[in-house]
Amino acid sequence: MNKLLTIALIFLSLSTFAQERIALVIGNSDYQVSALKNALNDAQDITKALEELDFRVTLVENADKRVMKDAIYEFSAKLNKDTVGLFYYAGHAVQYHGENYLIPIN
């Protein structure tokens, strides 16, 4: 988590003139198989840290596939050349044939 905050601070220092800072934070822990103990806590912690850095944060907790897709679509629709956007995900993910996939709770 400290590494992420360091990266975020560096990113922000490069974007001090951006008009708006928005973030999408997704925390998935309530999986039927192999639940994650800390993913939701991590998402909540990063949300608090980003809000202290003047980000307008959308926190999505324990999202199924539809909710994740909708949240990502809505987030991307808010981005423009004057916006600093940050995406953070805590939950299961896999890599398949060199592509990374985020795993919803269902």
Model-identified regions with their sequence ranges:
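Cleaved targeting-peptide boundary
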Residues: 19-25
